[in-house]
Regions:
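Short, aromatic/basic-rich helix-turn unit that serves as a nucleic-acid recognition element
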Residues: 18-48
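Catalytic-site neighborhood detector that most strongly recognizes the C-terminal catalytic loop/helix
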Residues: 124, 175-183, 195, 259, ...
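C-terminal catalytic core of tyrosine-transesterase DNA break-rejoin enzymes
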Residues: 84, 143-146, 150-157, 226-229, ...
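Active-site/catalytic core of tyrosine-dependent DNA strand-transfer enzymes
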Residues: 170, 179, 191-237
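Basic, Lys/Arg- and aromatic-enriched nucleic-acid-binding interface segment
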Residues: 85-88, 101, 105-155, 159-161, ...
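N-terminal DNA-binding recognition helix of tyrosine site-specific recombinases/integrases
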Residues: 50, 58-73, 77-112, 154-156, ...
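C-terminal secondary-structure termini that scaffold catalytic or DNA-interacting sites
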Residues: 14, 170, 181, 200-207, ...
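Short, polar N-cap/turn motifs at the start of nucleic acid-interacting alpha helices
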Residues: 165-172, 238, 257-276, 301
Length: 301
């Protein structure tokens, strides 16, 4: 499938006895990133570039806690969110840790306290909102939205899905571990709505491309713009594609699916998502309320 690709990483050998600078720390970090096959390399490189604007060319041992605090203040003034700044300084800390393990440094700065982050987003799609928004999306985007809404999968897991992963006869979609953010494969039963999506995609399948979701053979991109415009046209508050993931987890619980099974379907490794977004089975709350009223009534009689 065509689309933007990351330029290849080029790792220059480090001369023996060369001074350890921020730039060498960054190179070692990216080498480790590639070796570990971590996801979101583009994001990691972008964060490093923010760090490079402040620390580029500096000797590693001259970077101290005050410098890191100044960086936090600088990024705040630029309008960066606390969560973004924390991710960037975590990368810087990781750079030093790698250098320590390699014997390139014998110490690292004591990093300042992480910034207090805003509570996580709690956006959800109500079903009528979902229908209105998808009606204002081009078909390729609507199909991805459908799959996200009924699966709870992550965006990249959906966009990188291939027909090798789809078993329409067996009625399952299999996500291979190397394409999962958590590196754990999983199986998704093909429900009626998902089958309709996959049938549509099958009719649009390109012989030269094995990806399920594309737009005339090109990667489906610019999601934020597409959803923003569709939400505006539908008179629905702005939503993100990731809101489908939260919505799917909530809908599974509301449907009476045990949390353990819901986690297997969506790929959540811990139940923290249910606490974070206050996802509860409302029927259980209603039942608990009735039991409380019944108990009080009996205790007074």
């Amino acid at each position: 499938m065509t689309g933007r690709k990351n330029p290849p990483l080029e790792f220059a050998p480090v001369p023996e006895g060369a001074p350890i600078t921020f730039d060498l720390l960054a190179q070692a970090y990216l080498e480790d990133y590639v070796l570990q096959r971590y996801k979101a390399l583009t994001t990691a490189r972008a964060r490093i570039e923010h760090l490079r604007q402040t620390f580029g060319g500096r000797l590693a041992l001259t970077i101290n806690a005050n410098d890191v605090r100044s960086y936090q203040l600088h990024r705040r003034k630029e309008g960066a969110e606390a969560a973004t700044i924390n991710r960037e300084t975590s990368i810087l800390s990781r750079m030093f840790q790698i250098a320590l393990r390699r014997g390139q440094l014998d110490r690292m700065p004591l990093f300042p306290t992480r910034l207090q982050e805003n509570p996580p987003r709690q956006g959800f799609f109500e079903h009528d909102e979902f229908l209105k928004v998808r009606a204002n999306l081009p078909q390729a985007y609507a199909d991805v939205l459908d799959f996200a809404y009924y699966s709870g999968w992550r965006r990249n897991e959906i966009l990188h899905l291939t027909w090798d992963d789809v078993d329409l006869i067996g009625g399952v979609v299999r996500l291979s571990p190397h394409r999962s953010k958590t590196r754990a494969g999983r199986v998704l039963p093909i429900s009626t709505p998902l089958r309709a999506v996959l049938k549509r995609r099958q009719r649009l399948r390109k012989r030269t491309d094995n990806h399920v979701f594309h737009r005339d053979g090109v990667t489906v991109r610019k999601w934020r713009n597409a959803l923003r415009d569709a939400c505006q046209a539908a008179d629905v508050p702005h939503r993100l594609l990731h809101d489908c993931r939260r919505t799917a987890a909530r809908n599974l619980v509301r449907a009476g699916v045990p949390e353990r099974v819901a986690m297997l379907l969506t790929g959540h490794k811990t139940r923290a998502v249910f606490d974070r977004y206050n996802i509860v089975n409302e029927q259980e709350l209603l039942t608990a309320g009735e039991r409380l009223a019944d108990y009080v009534s009996k205790s007074r009689s």
